[in-house]
Amino acid sequence: QHLADYDEVDDDRAKLHLDAR
């Protein structure tokens, strides 16, 4: 599972992506 490894990064990037969009 990639998300498991990038759980924290995904959460941080997810917010940035949503904000950017």
Swiss-Prot record:
Modified residues (Pyrrolidone carboxylic acid): Q1
Protein name: Fibrinogen beta chain
Keyword Lipid metabolism: no
Subunit details: Heterohexamer; disulfide linked. Contains 2 sets of 3 non-identical chains (alpha, beta and gamma). The 2 heterotrimers are in head to head conformation with the N-termini in a small central domain.
Organism annotation: Odocoileus hemionus (Mule deer)
Annotated domain remarks: A long coiled coil structure formed by 3 polypeptide chains connects the central nodule to the C-terminal domains (distal nodules). The long C-terminal ends of the alpha chains fold back, contributing a fourth strand to the coiled coil structure.
Annotated GO CC locations: extracellular region
Function: Cleaved by the protease thrombin to yield monomers which, together with fibrinogen alpha (FGA) and fibrinogen gamma (FGG), polymerize to form an insoluble fibrin matrix. Fibrin has a major function in hemostasis as one of the primary components of blood clots. In addition, functions during the early stages of wound repair to stabilize the lesion and guide cell migration during re-epithelialization. Was originally thought to be essential for platelet aggregation, based on in vitro studies using anticoagulated blood.
One Gene Ontology term from the biological process aspect of the record: innate immune response
Gene of this entry: FGB
Key words, A-Z: Adaptive immunity, Blood coagulation, Coiled coil, Disulfide bond, Hemostasis, Immunity, Innate immunity, Pyrrolidone carboxylic acid, Secreted, Sulfation
Signal peptide (UniProt feature, chain positions): none
Sulfotyrosine: residues carrying this PTM: Y6
Locations listed in the record: Secreted
UniProt modification remark: Conversion of fibrinogen to fibrin is triggered by thrombin, which cleaves fibrinopeptides A and B from alpha and beta chains, and thus exposes the N-terminal polymerization sites responsible for the formation of the soft clot.
